[in-house]
C-alpha cells in the first residue's frame, strides 16, 4: 500500500525562521557523544600550540604575559570560525535579497480565504502547483494522522534519525519540533555532527512547516518541506519524512508501533536509547 503522504519534489521559496531554541540536556549530551569523528573536535589552546614562538616574541614586545595574549588570540579565532550570524536558519535557507512581507503563516504561500470554499482535492492540487521545483517536498496530511503526529511531537520534541551511507555506515540527523502558534508546527532537521561542532549556531538543512489553518474545515494540514540540496538529496529527505511518519504516527496497538514509541520515549528520557534499532525500523516497509 502506498504511503499516505504524497511527496512530489518541488521548489524552494523564501521564508524566514526563528533561531533554533535550546534543546534538552540529554539531546545536547547525545550530540556530543554520538560521533566517530573525534578528530573533528576543537582542541583547547590550539593558538598556543601552533604559534608558541610568535606569541612569546609578541608578548615580550608588548610587555604582556603570554596567557593574556593567548586569550585575545583565542577570542579572535572563535569569532572568525563561528560568527553568530552565519549559522542562523535565515541565512542558510532564505535568500539574502528576499522581500519583506506583512503576510504570516499559510497566507505567505496561498490565499487562505479564497481557497476555503474549494473542494479538498482542488486545494491539494493548488498546494502542489504552488510548490513546484527541485528543493522542496509538499503534502496534504489527513486530520487524524496529523493530530496523532502533533500530540507525539509535543511529548517527544527531540529525536535522532540515521541515514545509510554505504560503506561509511550511517549519518545521524537531529530532529527538533517547534510550535510558534496554534496553527503551525515546525520540524527542524540538522546534521548531528554539525550540531556537535556548532551547538546552537548549527543551521538546519531541512525545515518542515505544517499549517493547520484548514484542519477543522477541510480535514487536512498542508505541509511544506524546504531543504538544502548541497547537504541532503531529495531521496534522503523523502526517507527522513517517511521515517518521521513511522515513529510519530506509530500505532499503539501493534508490536512495531509500541517499539517505535518506546524509542521516542527513550531518547527523551535519556535511558536505553539504541540508534541501531532506529536504523532497523527505517529499513522496514511498514
UniProtKB/Swiss-Prot annotation:
Disulfide bonds: none
Membrane-spanning parts: none
GO biological process: mitochondrial proton-transporting ATP synthase complex assembly
Subcellular location: Mitochondrion
Keyword annotations: Mitochondrion, Transit peptide
Keyword Transit peptide applies: yes
InterPro entries on file: ATP11
GO MF entry, a single one: protein folding chaperone
Family: Belongs to the ATP11 family.
Function: Essential for the assembly of the mitochondrial F1-F0 complex. May interact with the alpha and/or beta subunits of F1-ATPase.
Name of this protein: Protein atp11, mitochondrial
Organism of derivation: Schizosaccharomyces pombe (strain 972 / ATCC 24843)
Lineage: Eukaryota, Fungi, Dikarya, Ascomycota, Taphrinomycotina
Amino acid at each position: 500500500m502506498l504511503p499516505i503522504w504524497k511527496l512530489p519534489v518541488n521548489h524552494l521559496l523564501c521564508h524566514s525562521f526563528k533561531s533554533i531554541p535550546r534543546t534538552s540536556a540529554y539531546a545536547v549530551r547525545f550530540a556530543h557523544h554520538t560521533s566517530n569523528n573525534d578528530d573533528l573536535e576543537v582542541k583547547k589552546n590550539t593558538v598556543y600550540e601552533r604559534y608558541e614562538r610568535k606569541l612569546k616574541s609578541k608578548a615580550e614586545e608588548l610587555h604582556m604575559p603570554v596567557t593574556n595574549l593567548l586569550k585575545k588570540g583565542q577570542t579572535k579565532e572563535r569569532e572568525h570560525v563561528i560568527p553568530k550570524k552565519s549559522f542562523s536558519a535565515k541565512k542558510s535557507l532564505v535568500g539574502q535579497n528576499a522581500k519583506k512581507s506583512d503576510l504570516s503563516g499559510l497566507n505567505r504561500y496561498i490565499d487562505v480565504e479564497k481557497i476555503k470554499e474549494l473542494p479538498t482535492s482542488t486545494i491539494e492540487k493548488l498546494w502542489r502547483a504552488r510548490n513546484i521545483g527541485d528543493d522542496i517536498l509538499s503534502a496534504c496530511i489527513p486530520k487524524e494522522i496529523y493530530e496523532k503526529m502533533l500530540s507525539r511531537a509535543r511529548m517527544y520534541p527531540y529525536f535522532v534519525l540515521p541515514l545509510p551511507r554505504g560503506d561509511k555506515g550511517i549519518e545521524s540527523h537531529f530532529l527538533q519540533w517547534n510550535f510558534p502558534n496554534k496553527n503551525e508546527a515546525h520540524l527542524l532537521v540538522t546534521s548531528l555532527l554539525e550540531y556537535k561542532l556548532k551547538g546552537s549556531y548549527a543551521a538546519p538543512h531541512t525545515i518542515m512547516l505544517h499549517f493547520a489553518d484548514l484542519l477543522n474545515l477541510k480535514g487536512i494540514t498542508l505541509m511544506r518541506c524546504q531543504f538544502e540540496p548541497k547537504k541532503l538529496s531529495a531521496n534522503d529527505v523523502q526517507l527522513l519524512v517517511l521515517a518521521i511518519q513511522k515513529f510519530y504516527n506509530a500505532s499503539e496497538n501493534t508490536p512495531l508501533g509500541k517499539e517505535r514509541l518506546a524509542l521516542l520515549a527513550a531518547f527523551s528520557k535519556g535511558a536505553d536509547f539504541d540508534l541501531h534499532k532506529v536504523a532497523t525500523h527505517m529499513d522496514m516497509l511498514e
